[in-house]
């Protein structure tokens, strides 16, 4: 992967599809691509391969690193509602923005404009806020609590296996929490 200051380092870009209800990792991918814009299609493919077992996904929630018109189109073609942040959001928007609906969407809006409008609605903001309590804790706990900060192996195939094992370990840890309490 290219790094700042010139040169290249052997780096990997790990992705995880996380179920919003259970916080279980349901799909993983790993690449050597430096940014996330090209990672929506591979994770959608992984999710669609699991659809028969897990049920079809309905919404894709992602941060600004995934935002592109192509990703919005890919989501809509896969019958998913995309909620991909277009830009950083203000932490303290004015009260009139927080509690009022935006003006109606124009009839000839592009898919990107429709998604941007959806993100400004009260329901869209509430749904997007779920990302902060779904996928962010997964990566935070994997890094901080489980102590996984770098891969031990080299080579895309081996590192993909290592990433799958890390996600499996997270799922086992999470299933212990989700398990009904006995006694």
Model-flagged regions — what are they?
Residues 1-183:
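Anion-binding and metal-coordination hotspots
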């Amino acid at each position: 992967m290219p790094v700042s200051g010139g040169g290249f380092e052997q780096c990997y870009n790990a992705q995880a599809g996380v179920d919003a209800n259970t916080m279980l990792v349901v799909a993983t991918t790993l690449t050597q691509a430096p940014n996330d814009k090209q990672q929506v299609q591979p994770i959608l493919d992984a999710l669609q391969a699991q659809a028969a077992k897990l049920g079809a996904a309905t919404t894709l929630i992602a941060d600004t690193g995934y935002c592109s018109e192509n990703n919005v189109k890919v989501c809509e073609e896969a019958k998913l509602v995309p909620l991909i942040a277009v830009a950083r959001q203000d932490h303290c928007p004015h009260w009139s923005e927080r509690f009022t609906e935006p003006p109606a969407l124009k009839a000839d809006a592009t898919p990107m404009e429709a998604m941007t409008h959806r993100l400004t609605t009260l329901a869209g903001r509430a749904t997007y806020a779920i990302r902060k309590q779904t996928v962010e804790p997964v990566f935070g706990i994997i890094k901080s609590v489980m102590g996984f900060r770098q891969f031990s192996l080299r080579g895309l195939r081996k590192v993909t296996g290592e990433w799958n094992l890390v996600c499996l370990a997270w799922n086992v840890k999470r299933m212990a929490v989700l398990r009904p309490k006995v006694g």
